[in-house]
């Protein structure tokens, strides 16, 4: 769910579905280090740094999240850092920040509702846009449209079987 919050300035914000449960389980504490490995609009990140005087490192590969990260950096200077990359690169990204140990990790895997809601991203069937489906449109050249229209039948079946987890793909 994406909403506008107005606390003196507008803060477009995505509310994670299980925010309370995740924060309760994570139990953020002062002077600890946390990672939100799928930053998105920063819902988990904001809740973590609001609960404790801690340091939070956020990871995302989608350049469109920078507008949310800028707001977080303004709200929580010296406590929030966005690292552009994939969550699979967490070790390298943290090493670049000279972080060798963390106290907690949030990982909300999957396509975000923001990507589905933005028709031009090509993740949704609800709009008449090109089939794109790239997480980072600046970094990756091949689109879902290219794959669907140019890959042979066997390759498409293999993609559907392996990544779509459809065992009957043939």
Language-model features: where?
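S-adenosyl-L-methionine-dependent methyltransferase catalytic core, i.e., the SAM/SAH-binding region
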Residues: 1-170
